[in-house]
């Protein structure tokens, strides 16, 4: 592997790490900076697809207004020059209706697998596979 390829992979991993850190800190604006303008965000289990930074931003603000006490625990993460795959467990408490079919106040543990497509050190597509359960 060329040193340039290793640098690209390291940059991709750093961008995804910063993205998750920003989400956990509820710094949505910083998380959005790590997306390309033509970002596509998908959550297949909930049949959701958002295109473009504005629509993704609206979804993120709604989603993160619906949860609190967010904690990420990374299980594994690896990358290539154009992809990052992440497997994590995220825990949170629901604060409003509309995100998951559970009652407000419910604590949730979610196994969250992501495939990120990367371009120029930013996320151009995020596919989030969500497997949740009340705890």
Across the structure, where does each feature detected by a protein language model lie?
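Short, well-ordered alpha-helical segments enriched in acidic and aromatic residues
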Residues: 15, 25-42
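Hydrophobic (often cysteine-bearing) scaffold residues that line and stabilize catalytic clefts
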Residues: 12, 52
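A beta-strand edge to alpha-helix "cap/lid" segment located at domain peripheries
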Residues: 2-11, 21, 27, 42, ...
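A short gly/proline-enriched turn/hairpin at secondary-structure junctions
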Residues: 34, 40-51, 62-65
């Amino acid at each position: 592997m060329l040193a340039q390829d290793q640098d690209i992979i390291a940059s991709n991993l750093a961008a995804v790490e910063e993205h998750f850190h920003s989400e956990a800190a509820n710094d949505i604006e910083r998380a959005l900076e790590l997306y390309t303008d033509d970002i596509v965000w998908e959550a297949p289990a909930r049949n959701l697809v958002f295109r473009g930074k504005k629509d993704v931003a609206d979804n993120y603000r709604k989603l993160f207004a619906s949860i609190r006490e967010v904690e990420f625990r990374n299980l594994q993460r690896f990358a290539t020059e154009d992809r990052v795959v992440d497997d994590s467990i995220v825990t949170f408490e629901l604060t409003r209706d509309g995100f998951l079919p559970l009652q407000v106040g419910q604590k949730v543990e979610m196994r969250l697998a992501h495939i990120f497509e990367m371009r120029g050190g930013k996320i151009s597509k995020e596919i989030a596979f969500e497997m949740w359960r009340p705890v």
